Amino acid sequence: FQAYQKVARYANLIIAVSTTDADYLRKQFPNQRIEFVPCFHENNRITAEPGKSDYILYHGKLSVIENERAVLFLTKHVFSQLKHTCIIAGMNPTRLIREAAAPYPHIKVEANPSKERMDALIHNAQIHMLITFQDTGLKLKLLNSLFAGRHTIVNHLMLAGSGLDPLC
């Protein structure tokens, strides 16, 4: 982000996708026009399924370092301590993710699910467990979980600048 600041000072308009980013940019560039534009997403109504299911879900692109870090943390400190089925689903899970989950029969890694399968996992999960270690704006997986899931548990960085705090 800081690498782009040298160029951003010449912009006529800077658009931020989180209120945190907009506030930061307004301080960095007080003479620039900074606008907050909420994230676009495909959800237009709540589609959460009624009832209960028997698993906790983490989903994301698992080859991304930030997501790998989140999964490794959840596996070691949360999922390993539970008795409930925990599903880690997403594209291209790393070797580290697979190895971390392997000793625990109740933790399942679902690699490269189809869109239909991922939608089913999201809709049917009892709990969505989403954490991040970077406050890099609104996460689409958070929006998808809130629109399509039953319950969502997140850490404070997942909500940073999103305005969604009351929903989690």
Features from the language model and the residues they span:
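Short acidic/histidine- and often glycine-rich active-site loop of Leloir-type glycosyltransferases
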Residues: 156-168
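Acidic donor-binding loop of glycosyltransferase active sites
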Residues: 12, 123-137, 148-151
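Conserved catalytic-core segment of nucleotide-activated headgroup transferases in glycan assembly
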Residues: 27, 35-123
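Membrane-proximal helix-turn-helix segments that form the acceptor-binding/catalytic region
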Residues: 1-14
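Alpha-helix capping/helix-boundary segments
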Residues: 20-22, 93-94, 152, 158-159
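Acidic, amphipathic alpha-helical patches
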Residues: 4, 115-119, 142
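Short hydrophobic beta-strand element within catalytic cores of glycosyltransferases
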Residues: 141-144, 148-156
